[in-house]
Structures are given as structure tokens and as C-alpha cells.
């Protein structure tokens, strides 16, 4: 092979590697800025923030209260518009899509878990978990079948017919995790998912999230104040002065 052919082959191999690397990223934020007007002043919460999340990666986001962690999740999830910059989801320009396209991509590729479970109190655990599938216009029978399977994955198969008020705090949060994962999303955005639980229950719920991340190859972006839980993620980033900084790995 002559030098020109060799160079061309090397270039094609490099391009394939770059393309494969791009496909590894489930979620990316580039130059994301978010500002609010408060009391006549412009308050900048996110400042040229950069973030990448690989497939199956568990990323913890830590920072002081009021530092903008929840705002970051809202922007990453397409629930709030950035003032500048862009978010890509599965390689698509998420924040630049029309509202209908963005909603469809969000419903297909993202799951959400909050500190307070936000379950519908009048619905059973089964129907709460089935709800995202029903929104996708899946039949009631098929949606309930898949919801039952996911409830069994989180150890709540026998509790499927119970309403949220009949479940413990840890059980309600496990239902919320099942609801977030039932659509098999590429990434789950979790805002203080264990913040309302006692230490033992929080550890159980977090173990479940880590196990499901491994078995389902689902990425997680987890906002948490708990350094012990953060240390068990693949990476930790700290939000300070509107900018994300990579933290050194902590001993588990």
C-alpha cells in the first residue's frame, strides 16, 4: 500500500473511531448558560456549563444548596430552556428541536426520579408504573404486563395492587424508579432520589439504582448531597459558581 492509500485508510479508521466515540455519549451539554431575572437583577445560575454522559455511566452531581443542580437537571431534561448553549440527547440537538419533537424524544429516551415520588395517589402502583406506556398509546393490557415485570425487578411484585398511601417511603420510591425505567430510557435524571429516606432505606434504593443501571445499561445523572452515595458512582462533578468541575474519585 502506498503512502497516500495508507494515509487515507488511517483517516477512515480515525473517523470511524470518532463516530463510535460520539455514539457512546447519551447526553451532552455544551456551553449551557441559564439566567433568571430576580428582583430586577439578572441572576446567572449556569455559566457555560459542559457535561458528557456515556452509555451506562452513573454520574453524581454535587454542590451547595441553591447552586443550580435542579435547574441543571431541568435543562438537561428539556423541561427548561437554556439561555445559551445546547443539549444533545442520543446525538440529536435536543434543545433546538420543536416542542413536539422534543417531547417525543424526552418520552422515549429519558426517565425522571425526584426526591418526592410524585405518584398519583388514586392509582395503584401497577397503574402508576404503566402510565408512561399508556402515554405512548400502548394498550392497557400490554402496559400493565410490562409494568408488572418492572415492579418485580424492583422487588414489589406482590405490592402491585396497593396505592401509594399503603406503601412505605422506600416502597414508594422504588415504584417511582420502576416508573422511570419501564420505558427502557437511555438515561435517568434523578434529583435527590434518596433525600427523603432514612439512611438504611436510602442505601437500599441506591443499591437498586446501581444494579438496574448495570443490568439495563441505563445511564444515570444523580443529584445528591450524600458524599457516600456519590462516591459509588462512576464520576462526580461539583456545580460551583454555575460551572461543573470534575471531582477526584473518592474511596468507597
Curated annotation (Swiss-Prot):
It is a peripheral membrane protein. Keywords: ATP-binding, Cell inner membrane, Cell membrane, Membrane, Nucleotide-binding, Translocase, Transport. The lineage of its organism: Bacteria, Pseudomonadati, Pseudomonadota, Betaproteobacteria, Burkholderiales. The keyword Metal-binding does not apply. This is Lipoprotein-releasing system ATP-binding protein LolD. One of its GO terms (molecular function) is ATP hydrolysis activity. One of its GO terms (cellular component) is plasma membrane. Part of the ABC transporter complex LolCDE involved in the translocation of mature outer membrane-directed lipoproteins, from the inner membrane to the periplasmic chaperone, LolA. Responsible for the formation of the LolA-lipoprotein complex in an ATP-dependent manner. It comes from Burkholderia lata (strain ATCC 17760 / DSM 23089 / LMG 22485 / NCIMB 9086 / R18194 / 383). It is found in: Cell inner membrane. Pfam families: ABC_tran (PF00005).
